[in-house]
Structure formats: structure tokens, C-alpha cells
């Protein structure tokens, strides 16, 4: 509920709900409650994720199932039941926090189960964007170029030292905001990188997004080799 409190302190309105995206009935109920409270649903962000960076040999099936139920299936279920609400509004967007479909061995070999689950979210983008294009519902993916200073990085993927090589979550928030302010029919089926998309929208200074400006930034997983950072900008 802390996120809801922060939203309301900033002048927004929030409806905090405890939702397990693996439970279809709970998802449907949450969407209905949200639509009733706010008069509709304009935007859906699929960000729920489970992670285990383990090899096939070291991944137990319970962990495998959890990642696929939350990442791929959860994204599918939430998006599926949000469609009837989104079709009723003027500028509907579905956004997955998932990577470009760069299907390379290097992304799978160290952690096949996680990569399958994460790319599963992106496959929903690929299919659903085509399915909903004629209905004017935008479906896109957003992925960070660098690691982002989140609890997952701090607690699971490198600790405080790694956090210093990250950008702040603000860059993803700003990129998402720019996506949602774009007419849905003009932006769909895209796999967007945060700083590249912001650069396309006129942002040229990315220095303030750094956690520690003195440290080199660390790249995130799944970044395609041909995805160059924006030219001539302060990263």
C-alpha cells in the first residue's frame, strides 16, 4: 500500500489491491473494481515478474512453473481480461516490461527457464499488437538499456555495489509516460528501449538518471547487440 500512499500524496488517486496474477478470477475482479472506481481503464502495465537465474540442471520445476505462471501466463491473463475495458476508451495502451525478441543462445544458456518466461511476455506483445491493431489498442514492450536500481538488483543481482552502476527507475517511468501520451494508433507493436525512445521524443540529457554519475553504467539482460545508445547525449 506504500505505492498507493505515494500516489495520493502526489495528488493522484489510487486503489490498492492485493492481486495474484496467477488467479484468473482475482484478476477479473481487480479489473472490474478498478473500472468501477475510476470509470474505465485506459492503461495496463504488465510488470509482475519472477526471476531465478539458474541453469536447466539447477532449476527445480516448482520454480520453473512459478516464473511461467507469473511472467508469461500472468501477462496473458491480465491483458486478455483488460481488452473489453480498453476497447471503450479513446487512447488505450497495454505495456509489457519485457525485452526485445533477440533470440540468441547467450540469453538462454545461463538461465533458460527465466529467459523463456521473460520472452514469453514479449511474445504476447507480438501477437496481441496484431490482434488489436484494427481496434486501436496499442500494445508495446519497454525495456531498460541499463540495469535499474530496484529491489531485485539490490537483493538478488549484485547488491549495493551493483546499484551504483544503475539508472534510477525514473527513466522507465518517464519513457512509459511518453508512450501513454502517444496516440495508440501511432505506436503499437514496438519493442522500445527506454533511452532510445526518450531521445526520439527530444530528451538529450540522461545524466540525472544515474544513481552514481562517477560509475560506469551496467547493461541490462537481453539488450540486442545492434541497439546503440542515443548519439551525442549525456548518458
Per-region residue spans from a language model:
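Hydrophobic positions on the long internal alpha-helix
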Residues: 30, 45, 78-82, 86, ...
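The beta1-alpha1 cofactor-binding region of Rossmann-like NAD(H)/NADP(H)-dependent oxidoreductases
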Residues: 18-30, 61
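A glycine-rich helix->loop->beta "capping" turn
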Residues: 10-13, 33-46, 52, 138
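Catalytic loop of short-chain dehydrogenase/reductase
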Residues: 87-88, 92-134, 145-147
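Substrate-binding pocket helix/loop in short-chain dehydrogenase/reductase
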Residues: 55-56, 63-65
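C-terminal helical subdomain
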Residues: 141-142, 160-235
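Conserved Rossmann-fold SDR core element
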Residues: 40, 122, 132-144, 186-194
Amino acid at each position: 500500500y506504500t505505492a498507493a500512499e505515494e500516489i495520493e500524496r502526489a495528488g493522484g488517486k489510487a486503489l490498492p489491491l492485493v492481486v495474484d496474477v496467477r488467479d484468473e478470477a482475482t484478476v477479473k475482479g481487480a479489473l472490474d473494481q478498478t473500472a468501477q472506481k475510476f470509470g474505465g481503464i485506459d492503461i495496463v502495465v504488465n510488470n509482475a515478474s519472477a526471476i531465478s537465474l539458474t541453469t536447466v540442471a539447477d532449476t527445480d520445476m516448482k520454480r520453473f512453473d512459478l516464473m511461467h505462471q507469473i511472467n508469461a501466463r500472468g501477462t496473458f491473463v491480465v491483458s486478455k481480461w483488460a481488452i473489453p475495458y480498453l476497447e471503450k476508451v479513446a487512447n488505450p495502451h497495454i505495456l509489457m516490461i519485457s525485452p526485445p525478441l533477440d533470440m540468441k543462445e547467450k540469453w538462454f544458456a545461463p538461465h533458460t527457464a527465466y529467459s523463456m518466461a521473460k520472452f514469453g511476455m514479449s511474445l504476447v506483445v507480438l501477437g496481441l499488437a496484431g490482434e488489436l491493431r484494427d481496434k486501436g489498442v496499442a500494445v508495446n514492450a519497454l525495456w531498460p538499456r541499463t540495469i535499474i536500481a530496484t529491489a531485485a538488483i539490490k537483493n538478488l543481482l549484485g547488491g549495493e555495489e551493483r546499484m551504483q552502476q544503475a539508472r534510477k527507475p525514473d527513466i522507465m517511468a518517464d519513457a512509459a509516460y511518453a508512450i501513454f501520451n502517444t496516440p495508440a494508433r501511432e505506436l503499437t507493436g514496438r519493442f522500445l528501449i527506454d533511452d532510445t525512445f526518450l531521445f526520439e521524443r527530444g530528451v538529450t540529457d540522461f545524466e540525472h538518471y544515474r544513481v552514481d554519475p562517477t560509475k560506469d553504467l551496467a547493461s541490462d539482460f537481453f539488450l540486442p547487440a545492434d541497439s546503440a545508445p542515443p548519439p551525442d547525449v549525456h548518458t
